[in-house]
């Protein structure tokens, strides 16, 4: 197999001695062979015993398990990542279910809040507004020559925690860790970026340890021009890169995506990735209930960019299954803090307007006041699906859930808000209120629920099921853009991997232990869709599978030879 041959071949490097040991992408620590220690000037710089990566992993895992607090575990793993990336990924891949919540949600939220306190070593690129005229220079300072995936944030809407300034860098770092651990994209090809445009978080501005630009956030044309300067510089440095926008505030997220999605290969994971994984989960849940997505009625709590992005993707899938645009939109109801979105509601955002309900269609509804509440909407719309993206805990009350089940025996309930402290309802409560009949998926990880002598596995509707496969597919086929069809293909491929939909039992989504298979399946579907949309060169299925193999990186040590030898 080509992959095996690749790892058997030596890599010629110009580094040696302490310089080599300080390079996390190349460092092997105690695993350097006798020959490598001689030719790379490492004798005396590492302990005498030569270890395998498995022996090293046993040691670091033992150290990891001694730590009690999740944030301490996060800091430990980040330090390992900055020291020896191959060992880090070997450890994470072999303990993915245990460690994903530590390196990403929910613990990454706490790491972002305390970023300046726990900061130890530089990773990624910090592009601050005062240096707006030096962006090309800063990109040239990146030592990685073949960057293929960038995740960028401005730190304004970090999970459900709001403005974290440059602390938002924790999100691109964590996200790219999952591109590698779940999608096999080499860490040598990834770059996390934070656009430091100031912060409106007064606690950070007052914090003497805060490491970002201590000014209120720039806005308007200043902000737009700065983002554009970054994107244009990226296009000059790495014109074929996949650029993922992450955790931008809703007032900026949709406009940025709309502006650049046809200019550079890019997508917004909060809008499109969240939508794709949610739709995949909903297709599977609909199949498990004996129907299709086009048959469902959907109520959202939360009408921001993420919620509206999911809604639009649901509508696209309903249309794909045969409904007209009008029919599909009549089946989706958006509720925000001011109530149900209607055509009479003032001050709607641009992306909300297509999702309003016409007032005349609500004439027969029985409501408690002028603002149509979530409970009013559930009572009158009679949804089969309830989705929470509000970041407001506890709003899926017992009354709401029981009202929903009164007209739908097996309601599909998805409290997707992150982190766990922001979830609209816990799976245990939802299952208790529905006597175990609800199908539940969450945004943050939850343990299985034990009730009535049964165990209910809880699917985590996590974007990590989608974006690594999208990235792998884009890299494998060389896609020039990320199209809507590619995202729909990802959703459909994910649904095909659902144990519950396929076998009638288990969780809505496969276990994380199956993530490589899932990512490869999604990558193939995404690449085929890219070819159909003519944004990638058409090749045979066999060649495409070979390209996916070629692009899939495993955390294995390579043997080194000095470039001068």
Swiss-Prot record:
GO cellular component, one term: cytosol
GO biological process, one term: malate metabolic process
CDD domains the record matches: NAD_bind_1_malic_enz
Positions annotated to bind a divalent metal cation: 246-247, 270
Residues at the site labelled Important for activity: 270
PROSITE patterns listed in its UniProt record: MALIC_ENZYMES (PS00331)
Primary enzyme class: oxidoreductase
Keywords: Metal-binding, NAD, Oxidoreductase
Reactions mediated catalytically: (S)-malate + NAD(+) = pyruvate + CO2 + NADH; oxaloacetate + H(+) = pyruvate + CO2
Active-site residues, record numbering mapped to chain: 104, 175
Name of the protein in its database record: NAD-dependent malic enzyme
Organism, scientific name: Bdellovibrio bacteriovorus (strain ATCC 15356 / DSM 50701 / NCIMB 9529 / HD100)
């Amino acid at each position: 197999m080509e992959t095996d041959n690749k790892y058997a071949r030596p890599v010629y490097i110009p580094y040696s001695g302490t310089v080599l040991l300080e390079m996390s992408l190349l460092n092997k620590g105690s695993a350097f062979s006798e020959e490598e220690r001689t030719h790379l000037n490492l004798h005396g710089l590492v302990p005498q015993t030569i270890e395998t990566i498995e022996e090293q992993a046993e040691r670091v895992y033992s150290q990891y398990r001694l730590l009690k607090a999740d944030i301490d575990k996060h800091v430990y793993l980040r330090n390992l990542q900055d020291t020896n990336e191959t060992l880090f990924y070997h450890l994470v891949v072999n303990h993915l279910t245990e460690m994903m919540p530590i390196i990403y949600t929910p613990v990454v939220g706490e790491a972002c809040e305390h970023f300046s306190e726990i900061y130890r070593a530089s990773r990624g690129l910090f592009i601050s507004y005062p240096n707006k005229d030096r962006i090309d220079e800063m990109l040239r300072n990146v030592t990685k020559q073949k960057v293929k995936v960038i995740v960028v944030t401005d730190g304004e809407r970090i999970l459900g925690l709001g403005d974290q300034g440059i602390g938002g860098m924790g999100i691109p770092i964590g996200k790219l860790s999952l591109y590698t651990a779940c999608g096999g994209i080499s860490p040598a090809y990834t770059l996390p970026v934070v656009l430091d445009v100031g912060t409106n978080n007064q606690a950070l501005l007052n914090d003497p340890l805060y490491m970002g630009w201590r000014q209120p956030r720039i806005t308007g044309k200043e902000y737009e021009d700065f983002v554009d300067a970054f994107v244009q510089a990226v296009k000059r440095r790495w014109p074929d890169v996949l650029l993922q926008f992450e955790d931008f505030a809703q007032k900026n997220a949709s406009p940025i995506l709309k502006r650049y999605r046809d200019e550079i290969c890019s997508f917004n994971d909060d809008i499109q990735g969240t939508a794709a994984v949610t739709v995949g989960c909903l297709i599977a849940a609909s199949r498990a209930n004996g129907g299709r997505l086009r048959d469902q009625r959907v109520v959202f709590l939360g009408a921001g960019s993420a919620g509206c992005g999911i809604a639009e993707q649901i509508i696209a899938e309903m249309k794909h299954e045969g409904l007209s645009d009008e029919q599909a939109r009549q089946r989706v109801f958006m509720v925000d803090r001011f109530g149900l979105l209607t055509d009479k509601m003032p001050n709607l955002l641009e992306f909300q307007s297509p999702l309003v309900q016409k007032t005349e269609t609500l004439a027969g509804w029985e409501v408690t006041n002028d603002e149509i509440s979530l409970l009013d909407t559930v009572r009158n719309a009679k949804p089969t699906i309830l989705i929470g993206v509000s970041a407001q805990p506890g709003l899926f009350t017992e009354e709401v859930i029981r009202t929903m089940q009164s007209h739908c025996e097996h309601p599909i309930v998805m409290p997707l808000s992150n982190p766990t402290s922001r979830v609209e309802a816990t799976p245990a409560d939802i299952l208790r209120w529905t006597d175990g009949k609800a199908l539940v998926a969450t945004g943050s990880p939850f343990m299985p629920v034990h009730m009535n002598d049964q165990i209910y596995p809880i699917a985590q509707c996590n974007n990590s099921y989608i974006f690594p496969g999208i990235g792998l597919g884009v890299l494998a086929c060389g896609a020039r853009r990320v199209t809507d069809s590619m995202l729909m293909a990802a959703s459909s491929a994910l649904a095909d991997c659902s144990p519950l939909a396929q076998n009638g039992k288990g969780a809505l989504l496969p276990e994380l232990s199956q993530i490589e298979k899932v990512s490869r399946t999604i990558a193939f579907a995404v690449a085929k869709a890219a070819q159909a949309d003519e944004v990638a060169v058409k090749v045979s299925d066999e060649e495409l599978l070979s390209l996916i193999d070629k692009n899939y990186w495993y955390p294995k040590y390579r043997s080194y030879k000095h470039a001068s030898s």
